Design a protein with these regions (language model features):
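Structural signal for interior beta-strand "rungs" in well-ordered beta-sheet cores
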Residues: 41, 120-326
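Terminal amphipathic alpha-helical/low-complexity segments used for targeting or macromolecular assembly
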Residues: 1-124, 180, 185, 191-192, ...
């Protein structure tokens, strides 16, 4: 897409600096996965600091930036000076709307060659190792790669440009969306959906407008995913499941989540968008983690615990309750309330 064409899709954008006109804008980037000749969105200081920490890399990759106009107007002058090193800058009074509007043409571009209707084996475009086992009634999309010893059971759908590693077992009726990468020695149980659209919308003029996702999912080696769990694709960069992680049945993992190595997510737990779970975190049954939360390595959430949006918990935390707090503190609070209620009851 040409730079000036951005205005066709998002007319509220205003260019404030154009040091260099890129030949073409190739994609929208996430700040933790910058792509060459792409654009990023900056809505607040948290995102700004991420970009400024990698400003030299952003300049070399010819990254352009669209910022929230009010945030830019209030920005410190020294930050503006740093941003002016980039090829181009723009602002908009409705950043979420601009992101939504621009996500669609880049989604259309990425999906233009994704044929979800024809089995890639008929087209001769798949790369399936002779040592893989493919059951009946399996759909394998174009450009799918399946490694030696992998077993794909009946009823599974693997959409184009996805990869299945060696010795991975995919049980019946699993759905794997495009641009999903699953490592070796994994076990994916029946009913799992990997790579479905993230739950992202912008409300404008009475409608919920869809944010079109292109990030895909990466599942590393030796991961087990229980039946009827769902892992959403990232918005512009992958949702990531770390090596050796174990996911129980009926678990929801939202877009842009990054789960470390050796984590355990028990049944009906839920992880909201852009959460980071470091290595060996444990979520008890029905535990829930709010968006943009960061939970340190080795932390444990008791069953039913609810961690609020944007919380940061250090390594080794043990949490319980809603809103989540230190487990011992929560238990003491529950005991105190029980004692108070018993005393009141005894007065009746």
């Amino acid at each position: 897409m040409k730079l000036q064409d951005l205005l066709i899709y998002a007319p509220n954008i205003k260019f404030i600096k154009k040091n260099e006109w890129p030949e073409e804008i190739l994609a929208i980037s996430a700040l933790d996965a910058l792509l060459e000749s792409s654009l990023v969105f900056i809505k607040n200081n948290k995102f700004l600091q991420k970009l400024l920490a990698n400003i030299d890399k952003a300049v070399s990759l010819k990254i352009g930036v669209i910022l929230d106009e009010k945030f830019f107007d209030q920005m410190k002058p020294e930050f503006k000076v740093e941003l002016e090193k980039l090829p181009w800058l723009a602002v908009t009074p409705q950043l979420s709307l601009a992101l939504t509007q621009l996500s669609k043409p880049f989604y259309d571009k990425k999906m233009a060659n994704v044929n979800t209707q024809v089995d890639g084996r008929q087209m001769g475009t798949t790369d399936i190792h002779p040592g893989a086992f493919i059951g009946q009634n399996v759909f394998i999309g174009e450009y799918v790669k399946i490694g030696s010893g992998a077993e794909i059971m009946p009823g599974t759908v693997i959409l184009p440009f996805s990869e299945i590693g060696e010795n991975t077992k995919v049980y019946p009726n699993v759905t794997i969306y495009p641009f999903t990468k699953i490592g070796s020695d994994c076990r994916i149980h029946s009913g799992v959906v990997i790579g479905s659209d993230g739950f992202g919308y912008t409300f404008d003029k009475g409608s919920h407008l869809k944010i079109w996702h292109t990030g895909g999912v990466i599942v590393h080696d030796n991961v087990e995913i229980g039946s009827n769990s769902s892992i959403d694709m990232g918005t512009f960069s992958p949702t990531i499941i770390g090596q050796g992680t174990r996911i129980d049945n009926l678990v929801q993992i939202a877009h842009n989540v990054k789960i470390g190595r050796g984590c355990i997510l028990c049944g009906q737990s839920g992880v909201a968008g852009s959460v980071v779970l470091e290595d060996y975190v444990i979520l008890g049954g029905r535990a829930a983690v709010g968006p943009d939360t960061h939970i340190g390595a080795g932390s444990q959430l008791a069953g039913g615990a609810k961690v609020g949006e944007g919380a940061v918990w250090p390594p080794g935390s043990k949490l319980g309750g809603h809103p989540a707090k230190d487990l011992k503190e929560w238990i003491k609070g529950v005991a105190y309330l029980r004692n108070v209620s018993l005393r009141e009851k005894s007065k009746e």
